[in-house]
Amino acid sequence: MGRRVPITVAEAIRKVMGFANNGLKELLPIELAYGRMLAEDLVADHDVPSFNRSPYDGFAIRAEDTNLASYETPIVFEVVGEIGAGSLFDEKVGSFQAVRIMTGAQIPNDCDAVVMLELTRQYEDNGNDYMEVKRSFKTGDNISFQGEDARKGTVLAKKGSYINPGISALLATFGYSEVPVAKKPVIGLLATGSELLDVNDSLEPGKIRNSNTYMILSQIRRVGGRVKYFGKFSDDFDTCFTAVKDALSQVDMLITTGGVSVGDYDYLPAIYGRLGASVLFNKVAMRPGSVTTVAQLNGKLLFGLSGNPSACYVGFELFVRPCIRAYMFSEKAHLKREKALLGKDLLKPNPFTRFVRAKLTCNEGQLIAYPSGFDKSSSVSSLAESNAFIVLPGGTRGYKKEMFVDVLLLEDNEGSEWLWTFYKRGVSNGAITI
């Protein structure tokens, strides 16, 4: 293999996204739709509310009857009926008459305001019910009007939106007993390395337990994919080639961990060559994860992630995550970006774009990013408490505590559109290459 020439993070992501395709959709019962992605726009097929209704318990009245009401001269209304949620009051409501109304009930035709129960005094006289008010009300006071929440034809949630409890409520409101959701892509996972032990194996000299597999399994599930794990394989070319070839026919995308460096036992580039796959890139100007390699074969993406845990983690979030989200129709496939204060000095120069694992906290409305412990690509411990990446653009000389930095959120379902054009060099006006 010839000398590897690094490309920028932005260029690498752009190349990958050129092969990120939308997937299929399926119908699920509404009770199973939470946590999935909408496969169609959610459009209101009627107004919400579909009638003028009361948001409070109280009395429906004609507002003009209260024009002269005051604390000294309260206005008395005869209570001529009662209406509960789900019921109608069809009788005429005349001057200085009121209808006792419950939260959610439809406003009677002759009424145009609601007096909250706690603003009234109620009493009975000669077998009739009365209530009095000590202030005036305007037409429309305390009424939820038809369509004020949503008008018929309004797009309430876009295709590709994450179905949270609020969207679940909308789906029920508009009668979706079955919900069109994005079908989960099948993501194949294959680990390579003769040094890998199973989780339940005893440690041996020179060996490590296969932690990357379970990390990636969790990342795939977090972003919404379905995992097909093919196992771990020793550093043998023919064995790995056969495993990769067989796996490709069963998945929508394939991830391999390990085998992407330049050592004698790193076979992945040669495997891509024998398969006839087109390598999109094999080196990225970033730390960690510079040897991340991505290829495509007949439009299907093959992600070669580093065997180092942190490099593997970063590679997944930058390159695999957006492809999975795009497959599920998301227009915000990338990690969400925010600004945060740096909680600790990071004075090391950054010749390449650097993604530092971080714990993001919020103090009185201000996000603060604290680097997570030991910062080497082989580190596992720093990943456990990380919920963000601090992004340090290439060409910067380091950052001091309390400087503003960009952070990418890991535990987030909103995502963002293309974000790599936002970065600028410190206080200068020149764009940074990322």
Residue ranges of model-derived segments:
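Residue-level signal for inorganic ion chemistry
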Residues: 16, 58, 153, 189, ...
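Helix-rich terminal scaffold detector
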Residues: 1-10, 177-305, 309-315, 429-434
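Short, glycine/charged-enriched hinge/interface segments at domain edges or termini
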Residues: 2-4, 9, 60-229, 373, ...
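Conserved active-site and cofactor/substrate-binding residues in soluble primary-metabolism enzymes
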Residues: 4-11, 25-28, 32, 56, ...
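Flexible glycine/proline-rich
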Residues: 28-31, 35, 40, 86, ...
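Intrinsically disordered, low-complexity, positively charged segments
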Residues: 6-68
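Generic N-terminal segment detector
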Residues: 1-22, 395, 406-413, 417-421
